[in-house]
Amino acid sequence: LGAVKVNNKIMTELGYRVKPNDVVHFDGQKLQAEKPAYVLLNKPKGFITTTRDEKGRRTVMDLVANATTSRIVPVGRLDRPTTGLLLFTNDGDLAKKLTHPSTGVKKLYHVVLDKTVSGQHLQRIKSGITLDDGAIKADEISFVQGASKREVGIALHSGRNRIVRRIFEHLGYEVVSLDRVLFAGLTKKDLPRGHWRHLSQSEVQQLK
């Protein structure tokens, strides 16, 4: 096995975590650390949230292919028909923090349904309903201002699979469209559908 040196000292400690300013050599060659990358995408319909798809379907990675040379991965997921904000990074610690249930990252969705939503059902979602995988309740829910009663804004911190769709399906509605408009304080402002941008330093600090 080749010798690993950190800051010119042979590394014998297992599990040592390399720090951003460490200089690492392997077999005499200096290793270049990847720069941290944080990319925000406004995902369109029809793309799968995965790093590769064996069936050859379009993935979100196709949309951010030119964003960075770093090996970024999506933080969480949006299903194929869902649109809106999806974050990518190579910062494993931040990705873990943002997806861990205890962190309680706020996500806001704009939901369009196949029929008018009753006020009683809004109240039930706010109070809590029980799905196959346990209880769930919205942090906030209301009709979208100036829109029809088929359009609802719902805020959740749950990361459970298809949770928004399942909430409304449980109450007899069909979700016509689902758009994530806020994720962990990040919004879609000045970010058209299908486009991406790099996070600012202050946005990264806010997430950490």
Where are the regions that the model predicts?
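Basic, flexible Lys/Arg- and Gly-enriched helix-loop patches that mediate nucleic-acid binding at interfaces
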Residues: L1-K208
